[in-house]
Amino acid sequence: MKINTGDILYEHFSRNTGEVISVIEHPDGKIIKVRWRLDGQLPHDTELFYKKVKRCIRDGLYEHTPAN
């Protein structure tokens, strides 16, 4: 499984839905920029390590939906 720009992430605990805005190469590893959207609130952006997001998907903390 590969995470690409445009993919959707869903976090069960906070009911956040996020869209992957970009995947950036960094000396410490890949960084994913996610724009989270909550109902009735302004969206906010976060930067997360690629490995952490993959681990959260594997452990069931995030639901991953590919863009295609």
Go through each PLM region and give its residues.
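SH3/SH3-like beta-barrel fold
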Residues: 32-36
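Short acidic/glycine-enriched loop/turn segments that link adjacent beta-strands
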Residues: 27-30
